[in-house]
């Protein structure tokens, strides 16, 4: 408290409430708020309502005690010289009484609840006299209304004409900075209510314009956020409000104003010096936000005022590219055509209130004026002086209160008098504002409090012009205005007004019919004639022109048609009943043909194949990724929307005749432009974040990319073209790549490289403010959050994320080489644009964006370093067979996609790699490693690693802006593709990669790289990405598992196969080098090195002390794994650790060499771990997806086919769509292949879940090849599906709502990420467990699982498809579709969840239980300490992935990891962890160790659910440990159970989706997902270990403890665990449930019966699920009996949720509608059916 000069002063702070005293060093030059935060941080006890504690200066030397105003500087308050050290008290802000007016009794009598309520009523009724009377009696007005949480002052601030009331309250002891229960001060409340009069009064009373709310946001931020009358914004700025406040996502006021199109606020902000170049956590400037949200007016203002349109976000995207990605072509045109010569900076100087005393010392004072945006040409010297530190008060209100008050009143009176004449008579603002510089435009710098200049510029009197208006905007008078002051002009409704300048007090100067003068701004409204009319009128022409620009090559790099090689072919596809056609359709969504669409050489049709499953039906028919559909069954579909095309495909049944056109760019240019050689087909994935956007958007983005980097588009196209050139590899890979995040080698610009480094933690990532990130979950920047939530957001996030992805994980792939942007950008925009912008999935990287973003570029840098890196990979690829290479490329892409998500990538890697692995097993490393080394993969992996680093800062942003994308990425990453591949390469150069670092990175890369199914995976991933923000994630998830499967089965596997093979393959592939050795490395990988002795903490990524419980647990797991070589449980453990840290490291590391070292442990050893990460992501993703959009979800699940177009705007899972029960069909087919277990399921899932049915189709082929692995694969796939499914759907529901719900439960935010993670977790089992499963088959369990698999497969025709779907393909499709929006939404939510989840990953999975928001910060912290990735959704995923990985590890070790690990990754990964994951996630410390955490979380959650929750949690712990050892499969089962149940219940909560999920989980994911519906069937399918594990799981569950609640069920235990999670998740889930369920229901319904029966057989293996409930009275039914009964009434999809929630027979009659919704039965029909069946039971 010394002079301002003193740096820090030691202050003794007494905390009477805690009876403590602390000596703290406080900065006297900082605001009291900062000191208060220091004190709060120093406390070891939490204080209730801590925000309303303040520093109190005790009375001394005759001076009354006073609370220090929070926005004043500490040094403004002279210290008490009576004490050796300055002494302050930290106490609750109560009224400060001058003397003891009343004794305690009297005080208590006065402050009764009745009195306080009466007082609030008086305030509400404006009874100023009564309020004054009570205050005179001594009532303390600083209290919260128990009902509303308001305090008297905040309530009064929201009332009109409350000036006197506010004064009375203030004089009666009300603290101006007293916060409501919501953390808002009266200034915030007045601003949010746009109550200029109250705001003026408060400011006059000495309130600071810069009070922070609970999120650290100022009233100005809220003003920009809320919009409306800009007068409050003007008042705040006039009163020296601080500019540049950032939320958790790095969004500043300017970003929010642009997000919501608040043009006037934006202009005021710019005028007062807002930084137009400010970048949020994703690197997006306000112009990027405008481009994303299509806020043309704001964009025009920004450009007019000199905003730099060339600034790139962390995805290396310019605003123009973002606009293209978002499908906002008109805006893109505006940005593109803007010239610097059009810039007109502000020539005026802002005026400031002179009353407010400027604090010279305040650091803000001077800078603030200097903060003026580039637009202001003349920064007046006085300006700085004029603007006081935000925290400064005009006068110390304590000392100068009276003077201030008098002055205020004086000012107020004078101003108000003038004001009152004005239209907004009550707008004290005029006076206040006016006062400031009546004449001078300069800010009245005078610190003098007096300066009642207000009268000079009475608003009514001569109006003072603030600044000239931006030309080109059209306004119409919406209400009449009659002049009331000099200079005003009359307005009549409907008159066109030309606005000339903006004046003070809400007055504008304009010209109307020749009259020029002033009028109130609220009398006119801007009309977007051009925007709407033009859009409708000339959309066709505009589209043509834009497409010409963007797609045909009017851009720098784009040239004419001659650039393209057009190859048309007719393909006749004949598929079997339960399989899909093996391709994912994507394209513009439109109810009616889009006549405006004009085919171009680049985009000959609206619908194109986003991915083709390698070796699938479509693949064998010669179809390749990126082929455009010209005719379907003889019907021309060039201009037809997605749904209709899907319908046409479905109508054909099992036969499909398609005429397609392959558009490839001429190779020469491509190679010349692109660094990546043919192998880099995945390069497209590295390409821009075009994936999500509609093809048109994508193409355009490509063009824009090209534009920005001539080589980029070429790269993208080249990649796309290259695939066409080499249809096999190139096609699948590059096409997929195109759709996916941009390929690693796509375009590594210097910016990207730097960005990459930034991401890696090099200087670049400065932009990821950890703190910002941290807060993100709860307070995601509203704009970004909403943006994410909105379709656009989905789109943009894709775009944003895409950018992020691009930079961070190679995240956004260009659209398919030939992917045509859907001409109807608006449609995309409206209906599916978000999905269109799969690019956002990369956003997962966004949280890490800063870091990751950088990272991505780094990848690119690597790529750039070159294309060489990519090429290196590519080179190895080159040697590989085309299919494999393709896969690799794809895998790479997927990895890239997944790279952003550490966890994600890791787990998919195993999945992805397995398919390839079988082929390259001998040399999986080599081939994989090349890819892994590939820049793209590396980037991908690195991205995850990056995310770790970025964790804290980026997490938040990610969440908001990129969370979705990141989550999507994460989800996608986890995809089998990512995980699988990462793993495969991992063995190769994973050896060196000792730390968790590698695994994340390696895993991501490895996954993608590692699988022979890179192509399919990539495709799938692309599809996913395309589908939505989550697309990437989903794709990765879906792709990954198939990838993993594929390797298992054969080099060129469909995604499905990969998925199927993932488990087996993963285990196999991961283990490929040597199952045991691989596992060992995995274990070792989990530790730090290949050796099993060192383990890496899943959360922190730090090497574990060998003696630590976690390390011991890991070692035990490793041993178990070693004994069960095939499983990859160790991998899971390592994966999480390695993943988190690894990704960072990997990110930093060079793709090749780094990746090798990093990846080797992760890849091989962490294969399981990786799988968990991906699985988790997947789980997360599904949750997210579910959350993402109920509508999408529903589409995703049941109507994936039609739904897929829904969100993805054309993405469709042909497989799934072709057959409503595609999943069923798939399942059947899969089971048919002989790998009924996982393999069929994954296939199915893939078909259903992802628009990559083709891969699925391939899986069938694959499946036979890899029966055992298939099993694992199947498991994995379902997990994948889950991941995809859940998250998006939930996201779909309102982001905010969901978040709140989830927050309430403590799961929503986590579920999004977590769900993503969990879902991913589910898929991970496939990859992770797959190996386990594969081994399991080798062991007894898999085989057990195997038999069920067929059943499951058949059974899960729907479910399995669903599982499959959940696996990713179907879900992914839908998911991705919904993911775009939901992802975005999720992004925000995810942020919280992510953090929370991260925490869990830490091992504190239960943290999630806490309100997501609170945990979030905590989570961040843990995450923070862990790899950065935790922070982001990715982080979250990572954490999930860790959990998953750990769980995976555990399950792999003890239980066929295939099912368990992945499952745990599920939303309930944490919960899952409870079981398998606990070991896995905390597995390092020890299964038990992990379990307690998991258990605690589980128990809290389960307790909430009140169902064996605790036992579930605990049992899993115990059981896990034992299961891990006894039945490796069992542990997996346990983990899987945990995961699967989570997936299952998640799905259950989703309702129909749940069915799919559930089905998928048990069958596809190992029985977890479908366990609830047909656990046995599903389990038998043992897509994941569960089926065999089911028994094992059951025993394990039971062994673990029926308490797990899943005892009966393999996931029974986990389900309860999940249940808690589910409960948490449910809030977000229900929304998605509603939609998804509907969709699922449709599909689920018919399939359900089949799957249900299937479970029956499966039940045998599962024992628990198929209980003879008919022989028992309802009251004696166990939860499994309830599940069997549900299946008997064809509502098996809800089984998982019911079991997760431990719903037993006795509970059924008492279930309410709300209970059913929580249980996922969101469809009225389903609920009625259940209730009807219950009545029948009662009757019988």
Curated annotation (Swiss-Prot):
SMART domains assigned: ANK, PDZ, SAM, SH3
Domain SH3: 470-529
Tissue: Widely expressed in brain (at protein level).
Effect noted on mutating residue 68 to P: Slightly increases interaction with SHARPIN and SPTAN1. No effect on localization
Gene Ontology CC terms: ciliary membrane; cytoplasm; dendritic spine; glutamatergic synapse; neuron projection; neuron spine; plasma membrane; postsynaptic density
Biased composition (Polar residues): 1123-1132, 1496-1506
Keyword Cytoplasm: yes
SUPFAM superfamilies attached to this UniProt entry: Ankyrin repeat, PDZ domain-like, SAM/Pointed domain, SH3-domain
Keywords: Actin-binding, ANK repeat, Cell projection, Coiled coil, Cytoplasm, Methylation, Phosphoprotein, Repeat, SH3 domain, SH3-binding, Synapse
Entries under CDD domains matching the protein: PDZ_SHANK1_3-like, SAM_Shank1_2_3
Keyword Lipid metabolism attributed: no
Compositionally biased spans, kind Basic and acidic residues: 404-415, 1017-1027, 1175-1195, 1361-1371
Effect of residue 678 to A: Almost abolishes interaction with ABI1
Single Gene Ontology MF annotation: ionotropic glutamate receptor binding
Modified residues (Phosphoserine): 373, 375, 387, 394, 482, 694, 781, 790, 801, 891, 898, 1135, 1160, 1164, 1167, 1254, 1421, 1511, 1522, 1530, 1549, 1644, 1646, 1648
Coiled-coil region(s): 1495-1515
Record comment regarding domains: In isoform 1, the N-terminal region preceding the ANK repeats interacts with the 6 ANK repeats in an intramolecular manner, thereby restricting access to ligands, such as SHARPIN and SPTAN1.
Annotated function: Major scaffold postsynaptic density protein which interacts with multiple proteins and complexes to orchestrate the dendritic spine and synapse formation, maturation and maintenance. Interconnects receptors of the postsynaptic membrane including NMDA-type and metabotropic glutamate receptors via complexes with GKAP/PSD-95 and HOMER, respectively, and the actin-based cytoskeleton. Plays a role in the structural and functional organization of the dendritic spine and synaptic junction through the interaction with Arp2/3 and WAVE1 complex as well as the promotion of the F-actin clusters.
Family membership noted in the UniProt record: Belongs to the SHANK family.
Name the UniProt record assigns to this protein: SH3 and multiple ankyrin repeat domains protein 3
Organism the protein comes from: Rattus norvegicus (Rat)
């Amino acid at each position: 408290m010394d002079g301002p000069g003193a740096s820090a002063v030691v202050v003794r702070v007494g905390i009477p409430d805690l009876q403590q005293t602390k000596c703290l060093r406080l900065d006297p030059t900082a605001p009291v708020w900062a000191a208060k935060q220091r004190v709060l941080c120093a406390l070891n006890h939490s204080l209730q309502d801590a925000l309303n504690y303040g520093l109190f200066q005790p009375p001394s030397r005759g001076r009354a005690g006073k609370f220090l105003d929070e926005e004043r500087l500490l040094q403004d308050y002279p210290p008490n010289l009576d004490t050796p050290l300055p002494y302050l008290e930290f106490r609750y802000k109560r009224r400060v009484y001058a003397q003891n007016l009343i004794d305690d009794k009297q005080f208590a009598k006065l402050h009764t609840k009745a009195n306080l309520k009466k007082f609030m009523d008086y305030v509400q009724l404006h009874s100023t006299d009564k309020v004054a009377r009570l205050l005179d009696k001594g009532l303390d007005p600083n209290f919260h209304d128990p009902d509303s949480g308001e305090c008297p002052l905040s309530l009064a601030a929201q009332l009109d004409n409350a000036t006197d009331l506010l004064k009375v309250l203030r004089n009666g002891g009300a603290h101006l900075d007293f916060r409501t229960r919501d953390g808002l001060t009266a200034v915030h409340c007045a601003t949010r209510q746009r109550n200029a009069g109250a705001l003026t009064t408060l400011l006059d009373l000495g309130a600071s314009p810069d009070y922070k709310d609970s999120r650290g946001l100022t009233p100005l931020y809220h003003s920009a956020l809320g919009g409306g009358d800009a007068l409050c914004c003007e008042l705040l700025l006039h009163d020296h409000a601080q500019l540049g406040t950032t939320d958790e996502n790095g969004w500043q006021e300017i970003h929010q104003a642009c997000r919501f199109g608040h043009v006037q606020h934006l202009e005021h902000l710019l005028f007062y010096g807002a930084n137009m170049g400010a970048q949020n956590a994703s690197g997006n400037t306000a112009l990027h936000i405008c481009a994303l949200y299509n806020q043309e007016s704001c964009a025009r203002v920004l450009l007019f005022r000199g905003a730099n349109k060339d600034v790139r976000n962390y995805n290396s995207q310019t605003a123009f590219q973002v606009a293209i990605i978002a499908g906002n072509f008109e805006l893109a045109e505006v940005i593109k055509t803007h010239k610097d010569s059009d810039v007109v900076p502000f020539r005026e100087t802002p005026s400031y209130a002179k009353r407010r005393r400027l604090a010279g010392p305040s650091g803000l004072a001077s800078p603030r004026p200097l903060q003026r945006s580039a637009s202001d040409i003349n920064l007046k010297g006085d300006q700085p002086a004029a603007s006081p530190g935000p925290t400064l008060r005009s006068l110390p209100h304590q000392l100068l209160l009276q003077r201030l008050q008098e002055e205020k009143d004086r000012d107020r009176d004078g101003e108000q008098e003038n004001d009152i004449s004005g239209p907004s008579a009550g707008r004290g603002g005029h006076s206040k504002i006016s006062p400031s510089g009546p004449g001078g435009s300069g800010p009245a710098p005078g610190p003098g409090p007096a300066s009642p200049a207000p009268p000079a510029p009475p608003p009514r009197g001569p109006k003072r012009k603030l600044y000239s208006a931006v030309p080109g905007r059209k306004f119409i008078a919406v209400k009449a205005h009659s002049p009331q002051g000099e200079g005003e002009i009359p307005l009549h409704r409907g008159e066109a007004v030309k606005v000339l300048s903006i004046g003070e007090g809400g007055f504008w100067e304009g010209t109307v019919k020749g009259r020029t003068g002033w009028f109130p701004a609220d009398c006119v409204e801007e009309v977007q004639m051009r925007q709407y009319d033009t859009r409708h009128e000339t959309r066709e022409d505009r589209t043509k022109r834009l497409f010409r620009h963007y797609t045909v090559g009017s851009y720098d790099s784009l040239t004419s048609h001659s650039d393209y090689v057009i190859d048309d072919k007719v393909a006749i596809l004949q598929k079997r009943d339960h399989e899909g056609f093996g391709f994912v359709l994507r394209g513009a969504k439109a109810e009616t043909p889009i006549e405006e669409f004009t085919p171009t050489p680049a985009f000959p049709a609206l619908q194109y194949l986003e991915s083709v499953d390698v070796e699938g039906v479509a693949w064998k028919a010669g179809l390749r990724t990126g082929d455009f559909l010209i005719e379907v069954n003889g019907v021309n579909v060039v201009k037809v929307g997605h749904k209709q095309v899907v319908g046409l495909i479905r109508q054909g049944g099992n036969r499909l005749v398609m005429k397609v056109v392959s558009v490839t760019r001429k190779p020469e240019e491509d190679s010349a432009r692109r660094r990546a050689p043919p192998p880099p087909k995945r390069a497209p994935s590295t390409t821009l974040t075009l994936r999500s956007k509609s093809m048109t958007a994508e193409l355009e983005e490509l063009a824009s990319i090209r534009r920005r980097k001539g080589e980029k588009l070429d790269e993208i196209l080249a990649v796309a073209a290259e695939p066409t050139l080499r249809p096999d590899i190139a096609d699948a890979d590059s096409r997929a790549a195109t759709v996916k995040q941009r390929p690693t080698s796509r375009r590594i610009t210097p910016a990207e490289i730097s960005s990459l480094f930034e991401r890696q933690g090099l200087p670049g990532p400065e932009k990821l403010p950890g703190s910002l990130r941290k807060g993100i979950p709860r307070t995601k920047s509203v704009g970004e959050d909403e943006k994410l939530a909105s379709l656009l957001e989905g789109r943009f996030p894709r775009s944003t994320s895409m950018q992020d992805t691009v930079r961070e994980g190679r995240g956004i792939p260009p659209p398919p080489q030939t992917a045509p942007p859907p001409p109807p950008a608006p449609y995309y925009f409206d209906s599916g644009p978000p999905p269109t912008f799969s690019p956002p999935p990369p956003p997962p990287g966004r949280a890490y964006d800063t870091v990751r973003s950088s990272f991505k570029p780094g990848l690119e840098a690597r790529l750039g370093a070159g294309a060489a890196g990519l090429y290196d990979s590519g080179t190895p690829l080159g040697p590989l067979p085309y299919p494999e290479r393709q896969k690799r490329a794809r895998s790479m892409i997927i990895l890239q996609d997944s790279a952003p998500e550490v966890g994600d990538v890791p787990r998919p890697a195993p999945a992805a790699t397995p398919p390839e692995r079988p082929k390259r097993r001998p040399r999986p490393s080599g081939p994989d490693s090349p890819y892994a080394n590939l820049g793209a993969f590396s980037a991908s992996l690195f991205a995850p690693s990056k995310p770790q680093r970025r964790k804290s800062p980026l997490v938040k942003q990610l969440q908001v802006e990129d969370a979705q994308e990141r989550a999507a990425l994460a989800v996608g990453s986890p995809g089998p593709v990512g995980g699988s591949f990462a793993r495969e390469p991992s063995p190769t150069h994973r050896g060196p990669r000792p730390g968790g670092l590698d695994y994340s990175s390696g895993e991501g890369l490895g996954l993608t790289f590692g699988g022979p199914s890179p192509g399919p995976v990539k495709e799938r991933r692309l599809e996913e990405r395309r589908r939505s923000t989550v697309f990437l994630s989903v794709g990765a998830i879906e792709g990954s598992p198939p990838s993993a499967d594929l390797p298992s089965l054969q080099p060129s596997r469909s995604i499905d196969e990969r998925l199927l093979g993932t488990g087996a393959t993963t285990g196999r592939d991961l283990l490929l080098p040597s199952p045991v050795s691989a596992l060992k490395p995995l274990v070792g990988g989990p530790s730090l090195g290949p050796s099993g002795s060192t383990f890496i903490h899943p959360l922190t990524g730090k090497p574990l002390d060998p003696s630590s419980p976690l390390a011991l647990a890991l070692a035990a797991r490793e041993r178990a794994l070693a004994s069960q070589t095939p499983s990859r449980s160790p991998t899971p453990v390592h994966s999480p650790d390695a993943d988190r840290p690894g990704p960072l490291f990997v990110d930093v590391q060079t793709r090749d060499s780094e990746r090798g070292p990093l990846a080797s442990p992760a890849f091989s050893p962490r294969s399981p771990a990786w799988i968990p990460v991906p699985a988790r992501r997947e789980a997360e993703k599904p949750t997210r997806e579910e959350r993402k959009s109920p509508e999408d979800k529903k589409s995703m699940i049941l109507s994936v086919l039609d739904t897929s177009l829904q969100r993805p705007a054309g993405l469709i899972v042909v497989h799934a769509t072709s057959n409503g029960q595609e999943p069923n069909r798939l399942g059947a087919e899969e089971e048919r292949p002989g790998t009924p277990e996982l393999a069929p399921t994954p296939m199915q899932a893939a078909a259903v879940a992802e628009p990559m049915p083709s891969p699925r189709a391939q899986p069938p082929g694959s499946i036979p090849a890899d029966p055992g692995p298939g099993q694992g694969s199947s498991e994995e796939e379902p997990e994948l599906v889950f991941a995809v499914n859940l998250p998006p759907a939930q996201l779909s529901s309102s982001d905010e709502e969901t978040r709140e719900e989830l927050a309430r439960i403590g799961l929503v935010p986590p579920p999004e990420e977590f769900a993503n993670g969990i879902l991913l977790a589910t898929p991970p089992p496939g990859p992770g467990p797959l190996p386990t499963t594969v081994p399991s088959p080798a062991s007894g369990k898999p085989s057990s699982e195997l038999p069920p698999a067929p059943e499951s497969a058949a059974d899960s025709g729907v479910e399995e498809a669903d599982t499959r779907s959940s696996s990713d393909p179907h879900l992914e499709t839908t998911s991705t579709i919904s993911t775009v929006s939901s992802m975005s939404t999720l992004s925000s939510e995810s942020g919280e969840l992510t953090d929370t989840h991260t925490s869990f990953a830490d091992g504190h999975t239960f943290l999630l239980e806490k309100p997501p928001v609170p945990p979030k910060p905590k989570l961040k912290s843990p995450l923070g300490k862990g790899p950065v990735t935790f922070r982001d959704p990715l982080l979250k995923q990572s954490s999930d992935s860790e959990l998953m990985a750990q769980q995976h590890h555990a399950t792999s070790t003890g239980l066929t990891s295939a099912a368990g690990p992945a499952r745990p990754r599920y939303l309930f990964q944490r919960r899952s962890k409870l079981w398998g994951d606990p070991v896995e996630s905390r597995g390092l410390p020890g299964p038990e160790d992990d379990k307690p955490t998991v258990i605690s979380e589980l128990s809290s959650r389960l307790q909430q659910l009140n169902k064996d929750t605790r036992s579930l949690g605990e049992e899993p712990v115990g059981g896990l440990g034992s299961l891990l050892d006894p039945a490796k499969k069992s542990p997996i089962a346990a983990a899987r159970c945990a995961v699967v149940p989570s997936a299952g219940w998640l799905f259950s909560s989703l309702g129909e989706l749940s069915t799919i999920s559930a089905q998928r989980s048990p069958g596809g994911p190992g029985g977890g997902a479908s366990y609830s519906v047909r656990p046995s069937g599903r389990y038998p399918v043992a897509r994941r270990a569960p089926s065999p594990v089911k028994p094992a799981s059951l025993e394990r569950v039971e062994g673990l403890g029926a308490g797990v609640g899943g005892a009966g069920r393999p996931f029974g235990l986990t389900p309860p665990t999940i249940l808690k999670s589910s409960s948490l998740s449910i809030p977000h889930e229900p929304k998605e449930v509603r939609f998804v369920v509907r969709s699922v229901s449709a599909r689920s319904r018919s399939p359900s019966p089949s799957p249900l029966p299937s479970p029956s057989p499966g039940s045998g293996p599962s024992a628990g699920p198929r209980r003879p409930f008919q022989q028992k009275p309802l009251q004696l039914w166990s939860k499994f009996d309830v599940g069997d009964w549900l299946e008997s009434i064809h509502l098996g999809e809800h089984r998982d949720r019911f079991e997760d929630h431990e719903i037993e027979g006795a509970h059924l009659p008492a279930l309410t509608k709300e209970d059913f919704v929580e249980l996922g039965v969101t469809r009225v029909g389903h609920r009625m059916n259940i209730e009807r069946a219950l009545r029948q039971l009662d009757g019988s």
